[in-house]
Curated annotation (Swiss-Prot):
Subunit-level organization: Heterodimer with CC8A; disulfide-linked.
One Gene Ontology CC term in the entry: extracellular region
Designated name of the protein: Disintegrin CC8B
Organism phylogeny: Eukaryota, Metazoa, Chordata, Craniata, Vertebrata
Motif range (Cell attachment site): 42-44
Subcellular location: Secreted
Classification via PANTHER family: ADAM A DISINTEGRIN AND METALLOPROTEASE DOMAIN (PTHR11905), ADAM METALLOPROTEASE (PTHR11905:SF159)
Molecular function terms, GO-annotated: toxin activity
Disulfide linkage: C6-C29, C20-C26, C25-C50, C38-C57
InterPro entries referenced in this protein's UniProt entry, alphabetically: Disintegrin_dom, Disintegrin_dom_sf
Tissue: Expressed by the venom gland.
Parts forming coiled coils: none
Keywords: Cell adhesion, Cell adhesion impairing toxin, Disulfide bond, Secreted, Toxin
Length: 65
């Protein structure tokens, strides 16, 4: 059983000095830079962009539900 390289096996949280474990805005245990496209534009809607402070990809408020 191999542990995730970003995860502290005791706490199941990111290791000291790391930002994240996984997510569309997480790469190599770090948050992607603000403005990085995490969901490309489609139709008449703009790209969804990483914030630089979260591993989540925030939804563009102009996307259809």
């Amino acid at each position: 059983n191999s542990a995730h390289p970003c995860c502290d096996p005791v706490t199941c949280k990111p290791k000291r000095g790391e930002h994240c474990i996984s997510g569309p805005c997480c790469e190599n245990c770090k948050f992607l830079t603000a403005g990085t496209v995490c969901l490309p534009a489609w139709g008449d809607f703009d790209n969804d962009l990483c914030t630089g402070i979260s591993s989540d990809c925030p939804r563009n408020p102009w996307h259809k539900s």
